[in-house]
């Protein structure tokens, strides 16, 4: 019998792509730099690659934040200070909370039946601030943010850290998330039932097998 839910934040509950787009646009405006959609495409490509490197243990979070914007700006051939851009981007991303469709409703539903815990590889300050701004914090029984846990998803150590403070067994918890690697692969390897939120209509690598797949958050109500 399920008693608790682990649920990812970015691109599962909060639309990170839209939040990042707005934060990048505002940051570029602050620095007097031109901005267009193709520039954001470059940011997404670089950012995703760096987060995959983090998940695989190739770089630390501090390294990611130090090189992210210098890498993006170099790829765009834009002359600006990457460290200052990172600081400005974080200023905006910490406050912007654009939600995924039906996120509020699914949190209301899940929290009425289970203990719900947020899981994330982003920074604690950023995620707590954004969840509060979205008025989502009231639905959670706790937060497992890698910065506090000490390890990143999808590592075994991350999930060990989660369960160390919980009265639940692995078979009593379901993991929900959009990332095939961080959320689903990590959850499956740990022995959790998983629900892959595939809102982009992507295909999965053959070695990643979620128990359930949904394309809209409302579909979770038919599973849990």
Model-derived features with residue positions:
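Asp-based, Mg2+/Mn2+-dependent phosphohydrolase catalytic module
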Residues: 1-5, 18, 80, 108, ...
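N-terminal helical cap/lid subdomain that shapes the substrate entry/recognition surface
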Residues: 2-101
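Alpha-helical structural context
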Residues: 30-31, 75-76, 113, 165, ...
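Short, conserved clusters of charged catalytic residues that mark active-site
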Residues: 101-102, 157
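Catalytic-core regions built around general acid/base machinery
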Residues: 102-113
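A generic structural motif
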Residues: 113-115, 192
């Amino acid at each position: 019998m399920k008693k608790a839910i682990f649920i990812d934040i970015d691109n599962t509950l909060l639309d990170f792509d839209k939040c990042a787009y707005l934060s990048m646009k505002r940051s570029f405006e602050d620095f007097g730099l031109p901005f267009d959609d193709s520039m954001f495409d470059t940011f997404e490509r670089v950012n995703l690659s760096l987060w995959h490197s983090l998940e695989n243990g190739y770089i630390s979070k501090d390294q990611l934040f130090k090189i992210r914007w210098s890498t993006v700006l170099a790829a765009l051939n834009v002359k600006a200070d990457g460290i200052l851009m990172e600081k400005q981007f974080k200023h905006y991303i910490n406050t912007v909370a654009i939600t995924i469709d039906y996120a509020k409703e699914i949190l209301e539903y899940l929290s009425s039946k289970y203990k719900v815990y947020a899981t994330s590889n982003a920074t604690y300050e950023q995620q707590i601030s954004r969840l509060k701004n979205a008025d989502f914090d009231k639905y959670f029984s706790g937060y497992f943010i890698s910065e506090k846990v000490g390890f990143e998803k999808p590592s075994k150590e991350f999930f060990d850290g989660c369960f160390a403070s919980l009265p639940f067994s692995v078979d009593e918890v379901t993991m929900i998330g959009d990332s095939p690697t961080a959320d689903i692969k990590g959850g499956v390897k740990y022995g959790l039932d998983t629900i892959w939120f595939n809102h982009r209509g992507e295909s999965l690598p053959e070695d990643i097998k979620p128990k359930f797949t949904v394309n809209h958050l409302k579909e979770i109500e038919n599973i849990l």
